[in-house]
């Protein structure tokens, strides 16, 4: 695994949520997703009811996460952001992966039941941006 990929995996493990970017009917969109990294694979959990997963599966997507709103000035890790670009596929997570995700939200958008869908992003490009790390 290349150095940037290892660093990206380490940094992503420090956060729980990020944003997936894809195209829906030729229009770009961003959607929030819960993520885990298991065996070097990026797995996402999204709400099926929004339908965003249909635009992701079988296509190249970008997924990003960061600590920009949590990093304090002078902290040793500094500010960082990670972006992974790769092919997306629908998956059924293992019991161990489901445990890593933790409990799903009960509802979304003011009361609709959360219906999870799971996606895997196979990295083709990884970008790590670090600022102020010591």
Annotate each predicted stretch with a short phrase.
Residues 1-19:
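Short, basic/aromatic recognition patches
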Residues 66-134:
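Charged, gly/pro-rich active-site loop segments
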Residues 21-23, 45, 64, 122, ...:
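Beta-strand residues in well-ordered beta-sheet regions across diverse protein folds
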Residues 15, 30, 37-39, 56-60, ...:
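Short connector loops at helix/strand junctions that flank enzyme active sites
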Residues 36-71:
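A short mixed-secondary-structure module that forms the rim of ligand-binding clefts
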Residues 15-47:
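Short beta-strand segments
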Residues 3-5, 46, 102:
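Charged, amphipathic alpha-helical segments
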